[in-house]
Amino acid sequence: MQALRVSQALIRSFSSTARNRFQNRVREKQKLFQEDNDIPLYLKGGIVDNILYRVTMTLCLGGTVYSLYSLGWASFPRN
């Protein structure tokens, strides 16, 4: 009997009302990403997307240059 009361209390505390604290912004995001304003899709999220894009590109290009440097260094053995 005690387990039944505990389970009912847990169900009440984790009900759907706790999920409604955040506003649903799907419609706003759909309008933002579907409008035709000649901005690339990966930059439509704002300044955070712009920074994330630049950091990702910098890391990718840096890794590519470093891997080519390592291949070149390994291909000429020391005597």
From Swiss-Prot:
Q: Which residues cross the membrane?
A: 47-75
What are the annotated GO cellular component locations? Answer: mitochondrial inner membrane; mitochondrion; respiratory chain complex; respiratory chain complex IV
Q: Which GO terms describe its molecular function?
A: cytochrome-c oxidase activity
Pfam families named in the record: COX7a (PF02238)
Annotated GO biological process? generation of precursor metabolites and energy; mitochondrial electron transport, cytochrome c to oxygen; mitochondrial respirasome assembly
Q: Name the UniProt key words of this record, in alphabetical order.
A: Membrane, Mitochondrion, Mitochondrion inner membrane, Oxidoreductase, Transit peptide, Transmembrane, Transmembrane helix
Q: Where in the cell is it found?
A: Mitochondrion inner membrane
* Subunit structure, interactors included: Component of the complex IV (CIV, cytochrome c oxidase), a multisubunit enzyme composed of 14 subunits. The complex is composed of a catalytic core of 3 subunits MT-CO1, MT-CO2 and MT-CO3, encoded in the mitochondrial DNA, and 11 supernumerary subunits COX4I1 (or COX4I2), COX5A, COX5B, COX6A2 (or COX6A1), COX6B1 (or COX6B2), COX6C, COX7A1 (or COX7A2), COX7B, COX7C, COX8B and NDUFA4, which are encoded in the nuclear genome.
Quote the protein name from its UniProt record.
Cytochrome c oxidase subunit 7A1, mitochondrial
What is the scientific name of the source organism?
Answer: Homo sapiens
